[in-house]
C-alpha cells in the first residue's frame, strides 16, 4: 500500500550529495541567516517574531535535507496551492489582502499567477522549474515593491521599469530596512521554493516523438499568451484611467480654488 510520505528509494547521505545539492543547501542556509540577521539588526530583539522566523527556516531546511518522496496526489495538491501562496506572500508584504482588496481583484490576480505558472510549465515541462521562476520572480517583485512604498508611499507601476537606472543612482541616499513580517514572508518564499523541489511533476509524454510534444507545448503557450495579454492590457488601462481621473479631479479642485480666490471681496 502506498503512503503519502515515504523515504526515497535512492536515499543518499549528505556526503553523497551532488555539488548542486550542496551548493543549494548552503545558499538557502545563508539566505535564511541573512533574513534573521537583518530582522534583528533593524528591529531589535523580539522573541515571538524571532521564533517564528527561526521555525520557518528550520522546517524549510529539514524538508531540504530529508530524502523524502511525496505521493503524486500530494505533489499535485502542493503544486496547485503554491501559486496562491506566492500571491498572498507578495501582497502581505505591504498590506492585509482581505482588508484592502476586493474578492474580484484577488481572483483576477490569481488568474494571472496561474497563467504565469502554466506558461513556464508548458515551456519547461517541469513544475519545479515553473514554480521556481514564479516564486523567485514574485519574491523579488514583492521586496522591490516594499522598498518603493517605503521610500515614496506608492507601489511599483509598469512605467517604473523605464527609470531603473535613475533609481539605482539615488539608492545610496536611502536606508534599506525590513520588518520582522517582511523577513518572515521572505523566508516563506524560500520555504516554498524548497517545497517545490520536492513535488516536481514532469509533463506527460503525449507522443513518442519529441517534435510533436514540442509543438503541443508551443500551442499551449500561445493559448496562454492571449489571456495574459488581455490581463496586462486591462491592468495598464485601468491604472491609466485612475491616474487620469485623479489628475482631472486635482485640476478641477485647483480651478475652483482659483475662482474662489478671485471672487473674494477685498
Residue spans for each PLM region:
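Short extracytoplasmic/periplasmic juxtamembrane "stem" segments immediately C-terminal to an N-terminal membrane anchor
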Residues: 243-260
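Cytosolic juxtamembrane regulatory segments of multi-pass membrane proteins
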Residues: 169-176, 255-263
